[in-house]
């Protein structure tokens, strides 16, 4: 008597594997996309550092006062004007002793305009914070 030897996977085994892969993908993809978005914040860090250095040069040229310093009259090109820029930048609340630089994510590459990165310079030092997708930035 001959026995039929069947080889391969049953339909049930294939369905179970598909379900497991689907569950793993649903857990991993949101984390992947947030990591990709968070990595785009490095562009803003580099630009904010350049703006900060320009503000310090402006501070010295203005005789120790940040109020005369704005993106329009500084010695660097606005980083938002560079091709492929993902952020727009603003200098808010410039005072005699400090300033605030705000980088707002634009809609390029799937960004949203509600996510911001803020750098605050005071006599105590520099602090960074974020909103929206960048809430964990320090």
Question: Where are these predicted regions, by residue range?
Answer:
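N-terminal single-pass transmembrane signal-anchor helix
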Residues: 2-33
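Aliphatic-rich helix starts adjacent to a transmembrane/signal segment
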Residues: 31-49, 62
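Conserved catalytic core of two-component sensor histidine kinases
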Residues: 18, 45, 52
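Periplasmic/extracellular, small/polar-rich flexible segments of pilin-like filament-forming proteins
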Residues: 56-138
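Short amphipathic alpha-helical/adjacent loop interface patches that line ligand
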Residues: 5, 48, 52-55
């Amino acid at each position: 008597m001959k026995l039929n030897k069947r080889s391969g996977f049953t339909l049930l085994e294939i369905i179970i594997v598909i379900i497991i892969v689907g569950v793993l993908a649903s857990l991993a993809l949101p984390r992947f996309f947030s990591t990709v978005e968070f990595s785009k914040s490095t562009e803003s860090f580099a630009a904010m550092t350049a703006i900060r250095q320009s503000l310090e040069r402006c501070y010295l040229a203005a005789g120790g006062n940040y109020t005369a310093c704005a993106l329009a009259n500084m010695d660097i090109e606005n980083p938002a004007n560079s091709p492929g820029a993902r952020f727009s930048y603003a200098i808010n609340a410039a005072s005699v002793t400090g300033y605030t630089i705000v980088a707002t994510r634009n809609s390029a590459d799937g960004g949203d305009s509600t996510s911001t990165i803020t750098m605050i310079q005071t006599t105590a030092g520099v602090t960074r914070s974020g909103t929206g997708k960048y809430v964990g930035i320090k």
